[in-house]
Amino acid sequence: MRRYFRLILCFCALLIATAVAGQTIKWQELYKVKKKDTIYGIAKKFNITIDELIRANPAMQKADYALQKGDQLLIPYPATKPATATTPATKTANASAQCSTTHKRAADGTVRIGVMLPLHNVDGDGQRMVEYYRGVLMACDSLRSQGIATHVYAWNVPIDANVQQTINDDNARQCDIIFGPLYTKQVKPIGDFCRKNGIRLVIPFSINGNDVAQNERSYQVFQTPAQQNEASINAFVQRFKGRHIVIVDCNDTTSRKGVFTFNLRKRLEKVGTTYSITNLKSTDASFAKAFSTTLPNVVVLNTGRSPELNATLAKLNTLTATNKGLGISLYGYTEWLMYTKVYTDYYYKYDTYIPTTFYYNPFAGKTIAVERNYRQWFKSDMRQALPRFALTGFDHAQFFIRGLHKYGDRFNGTQQQNTYTPLQTPLKFKRVGTGGMQNESFMLVHYKPNRTLESISY
């Protein structure tokens, strides 16, 4: 197992060289070496040549390589045999729909996955997407142990890729689902291809435009800032009825949170909730006047930056030291999840709620196990990013593969069809008009004063 996943990194590197030719990664088996196995015997067992086996497993090319019991080997398809049979697409009765009804799942139930992302080490985009891809592969391995078979095809699709060449690959038409692309200009051609061939397209990261509304086969995971603000305001108003709201002007000229606080104020006025506005530079006495002594207070800053949060916490410490029993909760921003090493104690102290579409919990047992396996297989830690890209790929693959395995073409990713508890990145889709599916998953991460933590999903 460990050796196999180390090999994946080598394959990602090989993709750089093969991208122009549109070559894909494809394999038929992950094989665990047994005590009496030989290289010749393994090759013969799977009807491949020794050279094909060695080429698929770069570690075997080292002069000091020795086959050992427990090694995991990538078994490629024979060079003369296609990975899967090609089913030619035919026109549908409704030509205007342009969505093929001839795409069929593999007879044995195997879920065929395509990954069309920049899988290279040239820049940060490629490095992040390689990590996402690793997460997809780890999910496939995990699902295999549960009896869910997968075939994975991967294409290196950098920013300047010839997308037409990629989708012309016969293997692309065999996919049940494709994850990608990363870049906006690649969405329409790949989306049109998926629509024509009845393939689901999962767009995992931020793009511009509204392609999801035009393509019923697309799944847009990323939520725009406007969508997230709307969800956050809805959750705020629902949860904090009967509270007094205190909005703190932090004098941050670089902040983009003014859109949130402006719309929050409009909503509060609409529902008749009282609020006060104070300033971070005000005196302690003036700052205290903004708070209610009879109602619980909810404090909202108009910036997500750490320095202003730190200054606000200092103000709150002074306030609560001289006003015992004052009820205070903090309502923050997703960025605050990056500051947990510094402010966790304060989050608990001030009953903090953080709105987000993901939550990375480094103390969760399943998360620890996946990170440990990642470290063993790839000899490196996951990138220190929020969200973790490998966990994102793991969650996305688990969600969609499980759904396709259980529901087949009836799967659309709604909350009612969810069969997976995520490590970090929950998904919940809703159709956009007559178009595709938009992720609407949203949660509040709540740091409770009793030093426990809960996630509240909406």
Name each model-derived stretch.
Residues 2-8, 24-32, 36-47, 51-52, ...:
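Extracytosolic ligand-binding ectodomains
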Residues 16-19:
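N-terminal signal peptide c-region/cleavage motif recognized by signal peptidases
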Residues 11-13:
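Internal, well-ordered alpha/beta segment that forms a basic, Gly-enriched binding/recognition surface
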